[in-house]
Amino acid sequence: IFYSDPQSESVENYMSFKYSIDQALKICPNPDLMISAGDTTQNGYKSTEWEACFDVMGDYYAKYPTATVAGNHEMKGDWNFVSFAQRFNMSGANTGYPQFDRTMGYFEYGDAIFVILNGEVTPADKKAEIMKKELQWCKSVLDASDKKWRIVMTHAGPYTSNHDPMDVRDYYINDSEYSLDAMGVDLFLNGHDHIYIRSTVKNDIKVNTGDGTTYLTGGTVGNKFYEYIPA
């Protein structure tokens, strides 16, 4: 089960998260894993929000293996993602930035490899350098795997349809050596937009499924929605 952006603050508001997952479980009653594109909280530094989330969803986290991404709201007031890292046991990365390495990781499942990146790194004047290290690490992981399907996850994607686009295109699309195209990524999962969109793209041109990377932006399992903004 793939979902994104619970982004709530209280037990009452997290009930939307629970109801959404309950509905998904009616369709897929025995999932092997759950994967989230992030923004679990509204304010990552507030322990009360994390406690509210786990009060409502703790049994689900305990029952179903879950991999989740660090979003921009996990970063709020917690630039090094301390609260996130204390609650989710990621396998880790090797970029030379330990405060961010602990928010990333990878795992293999069936005939697929999943790589989790963090595009919400700071400070802004170091972001290009940090993202280059992330993508170099990502490529090394993908190249070392013999799995057929390459899946990359992060919070904000390069193709967006809402009011708050993030500055990630230079890293995921425009870098000739470490772009998603160059790494042969089959599926890119992200959230952030609170709108469901999907397309298959190669070299910034829409193509048939299987001829490029399929970009899938999850909607939201929370109660905050945005209007779709056409490209």
Task: Show which residues each predicted segment covers.
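Active-site neighborhood of phospho(di)ester-bond hydrolases with catalytic His/Asp-centered motifs
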Residues: 2-4, 33-39, 64-72, 117-118, ...
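Short, motif-level signal for alpha-helix interfacial/capping segments enriched in acidic residues
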Residues: 15-19, 164-182
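N-terminal active-site segment of His-dependent metallophosphoesterases
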Residues: 1-47
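Non-catalytic positions within long, well-ordered alpha-helices that form the structural scaffold/packing
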Residues: 25-26, 143, 181
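Extracytoplasmic/periplasmic solute-binding protein
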Residues: 17-20, 74, 155
